[in-house]
């Protein structure tokens, strides 16, 4: 053999395996070396030995059989050495196989680690998905909370708007409450009544509905249970009609109830209007009654005054108690006053009884009234102020009414009226030549307001004039109004302002202690602690307003009641102004204008103007009578009427005692609730103090005092009258108060009553004297009638006697004066005495004329009152001209108009005596006066008689009115109870208003908290959005990394599987080549043995034939043998050619033909006789070309290292075939040479040749025996290898089953993930709809959600993994798309559900597929179609040798290698999409993986089994 051939007898196989790991890629190099030179080594050695033996035999013919035996033994040793080498190489190959198995196990472990890593990544991805779902849930909840918060915010805004509107409405209602408070009360009662009626109606209707339902149920039950018939249908129809009629009747009843409710409301309004009119009428009757009483009492008082002035001229001394006894006899009982406050009545009685114990009035510095004390402020000797001490402030009202109860506390002073009593007088020595002290009433009110804690009962003495009796009588004082003094008044103001009330002590007027006989009259002043306070008296309305705002108390809640009395106050003010004009025209001292001034004060904030009450010259009992009568006449009306009475009594300042606590507690609101609407200028000092001294001089003071007393007495009486009018106005919400009941007066049918009411109205408004009928007695219980007829008649006789006696005395005086001579001393004394008597008489005459003038005023009063009433009706009440006649009317013979009246000076002249003519003129004037007085006496007696008749008639009328009043009082009490109930309702409404305000504040607080919460939620939402974005980014990054890792793992798994498949194919090819080489060698050896046997037989025949030849021919034969040596060589080549071609065709026929076809580029028949062998054992040319094309076409898909390995294998196969061919040719060429040499040897030495042949036969038999043993050993080894492979196959099948079990939950998770994704998409869609519906759409969020919803891969997975059937996948796929799909979707392949579905679908078909389908499946690999006849005749070995690994289509590759068909899925007409993440491609790859796992058993099968 050639050296080149010897160098290439050993073939090396190198494999580079790259496996992925955590650190990158593990590269493993596998080198397999196979030495094939041992196969034909022994044949070469035997050929050399034969040549040597032939040469030796040719050279030494005597060579024996021992050398041949040694050669055979050496050849046997070589064969055994070759066999040992073969065994050694086989053991090395076995060890290499073990190494490959270990590497395979490592690769499988690596695959397991990768799958574990994939599972971990999948779990991490699932956790990320769960977190994402949780965040989406939180986002959804936050969105819901935000929507709820926004809805709540919208509701809060709406509530705020509603509350704002409600606040506006409440403000309007608060403004309207002052105007229509009583309307709301009435409406509340009506609403409650309506509610009650409606509730009854609703209950009745509910009962009817329940009855109807029960009837309908019974009817339906009867309808269901009754047999079909005309009678049942008729009854059912009748019942239905009855039910319908009942329902209509119920509806009609409801409508009638609504109409009746409206009618009831209208009727109630009408009745309330009639009731208000009746109240006005009753009020007018009451005024008429009180006016008549005042007229009667005034007449009696005038008669008493006339009797006192015109009586006998008795010496003036201390006044007795007769006048007070008259008061006691004329007083009436006061059961109401005693019932209201028996303690006060007892104190009053005790104070009136103080004449029995005059010195015990003020022991230990206290008054006998108990806790009530007096403080004394005396600026000089000109004035004294009596005020209650601080103990009296502790007495609080016992019974509170309405909401005023809550506003009175112990710390606040009482808000009742202050009674200011101004008593003015002068001593006898100062009353004629000293001006009266001025006291500013507004200043007094200011001081009172500045010290509201002190009870204001002021007894201001501006002069030291006695209060009773004429001049020179210290026992009787004359009360006067305060007069203006420019300097002393200012001093008193300063001193009173700087002094604080001293500690309580019992003080009184300076003259009280000296006149204890007047204790009863004086004790009346000590009743002042029972009089209510009034701390709101100031000089100006602004001061009043400031006082009220700073420390007033509860006036703000009470000013509502004053608005209804505005008209009344205005009318009273107008009348007060009229009366002021009339009083100024007469130069009267009056404070009636204080009513209008008080109403002006009340316009600003409801303050009251200070009034002053004065007493006429006479007894204090007469002064106290109208004051106390005002209390007695009202005390019968109950606490409600008393409370209203005190509202008007605030206009007048006077002594008022014995009031109950109910009267005290509600007085201030009435006092300050007059005429808020009037806009009058603040009255000046001249208006406030109408008691200025006019131009008529000091001589008219008595007349002024008289008329002021009359006006103030009527004011005091009118204070007790006007409260009833105010009481009636509390019940008239829509009716404007017309002032003291005048509106109801014209409606009376009796003209006399009408006139009397007009007169009373005018008297009540202007303050003309209407004296009360009753006055308290000393004991406080027994009233009498002033107008008793006997007393009047007695007074008439006394008046007549007094005038006659006066005339006689005057005449006697003048006669005595006439006897006196001028110039004598006695004349002077008599003249001075006469002057004193004349001055005394002038005073008496002045008083008498004063009564006459007041009587003349009363005569003109009826006409003026009628004119006043007419002027009020015609709207001319404001004109002062209507009432000036009342004050300007003069009586003939008025002393003010008598000639030379001012000549009678107040003081007796101190100069020389007047002439006698003056005395005559005085005498004549006195005579005229006496005649005038007589005429007046007759006129007065006539008028008295008429008045007595009128008094009797009026008395009867008064009794009827009293009875009527009692009835009306019951009605009033009932109305008052309704009023209290309505007040409670108003308080309830106020509480509800407070609750509403509290609810509003709570809602505002809740709104603020909600805003804060919303801001916090928005911030948290933004934070969560940021976290969600970061999480999404991290999730996408992890998913991307996972996908990249999965792609890498899939690619590495694919490469690993490709390498494993290539290794298996290479190993099978190697084993097959080895087996084929051994078989060829055995065939060649068996043929050689047969040839040797034939040659042995030929040689034996030749030996037998040539034994007879001679020795001579031996030399010639030897030469001939040497000459034909070359020819033997050629002959040997010719003889060996068929065997060589056969061996070549067997040993390396297919590879050689493949190499020849690859080299030549075409197919053709091979040389020699190999065509017959090729027809049976090798594939046809088309198949070879096809396999070659497939290998060439698929080499492009393999990596560069694999391509190099394939080329290296091909290059190694070529020299192996050539070497084998050369060995076969050399071994076969030895046969003819040996035969020729043996023929010559036979010819030379037949025996020797026979022995050699026999030895050779034995050797060959031994060799055959050894080769059989070796063949048997190789078969055993092949069987063992097959068993090992079968065990490995079983292990792989177990691993496949485990992989299936591991893959099953992953597939279920994929399906569940698909379902969750669908649910997530639905939730996102719902959330987007909710956001758009609430107006919270976000474009970025909508686009993001739309991108998530438009996931094509998710839609395909949904259609694939959640479909009821599994679609069949088409195999018409390109390799690149399959690889990409395998890389991108390996995590979604291992679905147990899909695996079970695939197994069920695959089990429905048989594994072998029809032969016509197989070429169609492989048509994409080659454009040439394989004939059906050739498919069944394919040799698996040749197919395995010709096919390379195709990574993308393992199923088709395995079909070509082993001829095993694989199952194919049915096409479901689902076109494979072009996306790389197509589920169809994933399913196809999944199917191929399963087929590759199932076909592992075919890959590892033994080549002997493949042949079998």
From Swiss-Prot:
InterPro entries: DUF4527. Residues 868-881, 1204-1215 have a biased composition (Basic and acidic residues). Residues 1163-1172, 1220-1230 have a biased composition (Polar residues). The keyword Manganese does not apply. It comes from Homo sapiens. Keywords: Coiled coil. Residues 149-267, 972-1034, 1271-1302 form a coiled coil. Residues 248-268, 345-403, 536-575, 725-754, 868-916, 1158-1186, 1204-1246 are annotated as: Disordered. PANTHER family: CHROMOSOME 4 OPEN READING FRAME 50 (PTHR36866), GENE 1043-RELATED (PTHR36866:SF1). This is Uncharacterized protein C4orf50.
